[in-house]
């Protein structure tokens, strides 16, 4: 399962885009989105999801 970004809570700071090791986070239109075909929840390389760990707003990057 991939992660998603709750657009209404996102501050559009861009931290998640630069932190994602798989390049799954991109700015599309007016918001950041996570490509579910690229997101693997950082399994195999990290103890936590990198997008969620750098997000300044709790519960903005969540399981889809």
Swiss-Prot record:
Binding site for [4Fe-4S] cluster 1: 10, 13, 16, 55
Domain 4Fe-4S ferredoxin-type, residue spans: 2-30
Protein residues bound to [4Fe-4S] cluster 2: 20, 39, 42, 51
GO molecular function, one term: 4 iron, 4 sulfur cluster binding
Origin: domain of life: Bacteria
InterPro entries assigned: 4Fe4S_Fe-S-bd, 4Fe4S_Fe_S_CS
Keyword Membrane assigned: no
Gene Ontology terms: biological process: nitrogen fixation
UniProt cofactor note: Binds 2 [4Fe-4S] clusters.
Keyword Electron transport on entry: yes
Keywords: 4Fe-4S, Electron transport, Iron, Iron-sulfur, Metal-binding, Nitrogen fixation, Plasmid, Repeat, Transport
Cofactor dependency: [4Fe-4S] cluster
Gene3D superfamilies hit by this protein: 3.30.70.20
The protein's name: Ferredoxin-like protein in nif region
């Amino acid at each position: 399962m991939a992660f998603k970004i709750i657009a209404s809570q996102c501050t559009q700071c861009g931290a998640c885009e630069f932190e994602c090791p798989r390049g799954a986070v991109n700015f599309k239109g007016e918001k950041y989105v996570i490509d579910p075909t690229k997101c693997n929840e950082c399994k195999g390389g990290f103890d936590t999801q990198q997008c969620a760990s750098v997000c300044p707003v709790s519960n903005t990057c969540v399981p889809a």
